[in-house]
């Protein structure tokens, strides 16, 4: 059936695609190696992949040298065909990487599988580069009715709106590969799988790649239909009696995917660590961590795998777990082929190049910006009664509507937006000027959605507690009829009946059912897993009309809604409150619109602060996040690579995506360096020496003044002078706010969960009346984070506002105070104080007198007095410098600074270029190896010792620390209950505000030994030049749940342990399951050294925690 569809898909392009492509051999620089390093490599079938050099048909021109990015010379017609403006042509970097013909030996592979040795290419050797070919683009269209959206006006004047989208294809080809353009592909008859619907063009192209036994990356929006491609790969493998592995980033997604594939194909197994079902099945669903473990252990299963499907491959950029994807992809054999399913990523072709480089096989990229259900994006200004369409289904940004929304927001904020400064999100329960009580914003939005029949709706919030609070606000609404309520109760009771009677009485279970019966759900990581699954099932069945969820709901799970609402446009990322990125918005808003059910998806953003049009456009129409490597070394990785024959940690570093991406920067950096160097060399300044001396003097003075400012702004010295009406000079970074008037001073609140105190100069907030840019919006303090505000530009008249600044922003405290009225809410009162400030500045044209730090502020420390003397001396030197009164000083000095900036740029580029040419993270690898040698995990020749083999078994916790504790006899005298409690320190990562005040002695003792051992490891690490903060390392082992785990292991009920901590129930269960996984690894570690007593103790430890709701089975299984 695919033959006809492919003819339709490719027929238009037959005249465009084939042009002759010439290949050139390039010189490769091998970054660190001056001699040939021989490696024993495996996979005897790889030699069959060698083919003679042939001309490849392609739509690209000649490829240039390896030191320059490949260009496409003959793509005038097709230049726009590269997905998302990827650079024309593709360059596979050869720096420091072995161009081997075979895969390294993984695990204990039979001797007859070991092939001949191949050496890494040295400088001067030639390695043919991979090329990119078969680039084409197809435009498809979708028609939707031009009907009324959520506003009263039509989104389009047309009766029918035609929406166009592109399907783009490229392929990265290894050298000497006999490639046939995909337009000439003919599908087999019959195909491996047929569908009762017409395939979308991107699906047909992707399936054609699979039929050709060639890897493919499918990059498309959520709900576009990528699963169809994965299912075809499974069906083809089952037909050909070949093993296929389906990997996903999270266990919940693996469970759900297992259920779907089992229903579709039958011969399906599951391996997640927690559960193993039918491990001999032809199709195995597993987490990526399990696949990596199988590769390191040389599992027999891997010898039979023809296809590996990586779902949600964009998860590879995750800082913590993304490295697992890279390890796995590198370790997989070359004979396996891959299907990568991804959200839209702008550098998809770069990823395909990397796959071609490390596995010497073609990798196609099929990219589409197709949305089966187009989206309309609305803004809801806080406190208003209407929404504004700002981006229509054709992706047009409606500037006029955006400005209306901003005007409505400013009007509703009242005359004093800063009055809301410390109230955070309290306004969500208010509307109108002055904060008159009324229905909350979310209540109004949900009610409007229900009235207009735009449910089901997912309401995204970035806080678990806010999810629950907003859901409770909806409890007056009843969105289900009696039949639906009864059905919800039946499904819910059937699910929780597997729990014990005590567990069914947990508050979370009892309190959520009334909400579910009303059609209101909650979904976040703090929920009990069984409740999350029940809610997912109810939502899929249409029994929940409103779902309040955190961002994690947007990952993987295929549960679209008709409408998506964002309660905030800012999120806390662990450091600051920032705008949602374009990639995050795309991922979450992609849940709007159900294919086949809705002709449009609706997205509503609740906004509570002014947003500039560029910010809104970058969020609503921005590019998806790039797929950038998050590769980092770990001791477990290094030890496993040292243990396995034929590969090494250097092997991993040379082939990782991180190294590949950095190497691609070399040509750009070289070009930029050459340009900057030429610019610097041609930059001449007459009589430069005096300017250099003047600059040195001024820089030194500025440094001393900064030191003075740090002392003066210490709360102990300045707080008593910061009364209301005091004049202060404010400077934030390079932005000068000039003089302002102190309104009041308040203690800066710590963000929730942050235990580290601020620096003294950052621990207080000075609310100051200053002149700011005219377009400044509401100024709120969010969990201790100050709003972004700017002084008026030269052409801007500006306006007076009360702005929160840190003490560190004060650049001077004046002698003078002005009268301050009791109330500064109105703009008129602010203007009155502003006029008084202007009058003071007029009366002191030479400058307002500052408080003297020594005489007035009484700072008498000898070191400070010395510092002040240095400042005075340097100031007098600067004033007596011949250039000080030079009429052209400002112009000449600015010119000198430009030259200095150029010099810094050249130095910086040289450093970056040197770094890009070398093997990344090699210094860190060497320092980690020194640590392993000093602790006795490896020999001086990097041969793994017994300690190292034990540590190889432990991947769910700190392998070094646990191995040291095992060999130290730490667990010999502990009971199983104590073992469980102590090991919880290594798996609990969340923050808890309830710390153990008085820990039981039987727990405090082992904890102290663990911390002492951690300090020893930290000391050895620092001595080995490993960057490690000792206190941070020791504090990373959190004892917050030791008492909780100890009580559970002694038989306490789940309800009892929940009362002992503020940690969410779902987080507790997740911790217990990770703990069990770690203890199982401890059992394996004990087996390695033949310690049967430790093995038995760890098995007893599992027995005392493995019970009840903590380990209840998934509803998907």
UniProtKB/Swiss-Prot annotation:
Any single GO CC term annotated in Swiss-Prot or TrEMBL for this entry: TRAMP complex
Signal peptide (residue range): none
Subcellular location: Nucleus
Placement of sequence motif DEIH box: 311-314
PROSITE patterns documented for this protein: HELICASE_ATP_BIND_1, HELICASE_CTER
Keywords: ATP-binding, Helicase, Hydrolase, Nucleotide-binding, Nucleus, rRNA processing
EC code: 3.6.4.-
Enzyme superclass (EC): hydrolase
Residues involved in ATP binding: 220-227
Annotated region (Disordered), positions in chain: 19-86, 414-433
InterPro entries according to UniProt: DEAD/DEAH_box_helicase_dom, Helicase_ATP-bd, Helicase_C-like, MTR4-like_stalk, MTR4_beta-barrel, P-loop_NTPase, RNA-DNA_Helicase, SKI2-like
Quaternary context: Component of the TRAMP complex composed of at least cid14, mtr4, and air1.
Family membership noted in the UniProt record: Belongs to the helicase family. SKI2 subfamily.
Protein name: ATP-dependent RNA helicase mtr4
Gene: mtr4
